Amino acid sequence: MSNAKLKDYEEILHAAQLYIDGCAKGDGEMMKPAFHENATINGAPIQTLFDGATQAGPADSKARVDVLDVVNDIAVIRITLENYFGADYVDFHALKKDEDGWKIMAKIFTEV
């Protein structure tokens, strides 16, 4: 049902890449621009993610991003992280586009 422009996909993937790079480098500050200030992670404040990534430090992991759907100003992506400190994860991120561009509003994840 996507009606997005190529620019939307590029901006969505950029937000995802900021998150992935922050995970890989163990740098919560690096991923902050990808997230809305009121974003949540599994229902908790997003600062939990930033603090956890920084505390964990760099990780030798691989990631894949799939844009599942984009409709007007909302999108859903799936991020698969392999070997993030020895575990594999699947995330779903809900994004919303506003005057500041595409921002992740919510992140849910599970270990697989």
State what each model feature region is:
Residues M1-E29, P33-E37:
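Short, low-complexity N-terminal intrinsically disordered segments enriched in polar/charged residues
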Residues A4, D8-E11, T40-F92:
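Surface-exposed, charged secondary-structure patches
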Residues F35, L81-N83, I108-F109:
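Short beta-strand segments enriched in hydrophobic/aromatic residues
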Residues N38-A39, V112:
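Feature marks short, surface-exposed loop/turn motifs that line or immediately flank catalytic pockets
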Residues D88-V112:
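Short beta-strand edge/turn micro-motifs at domain boundaries
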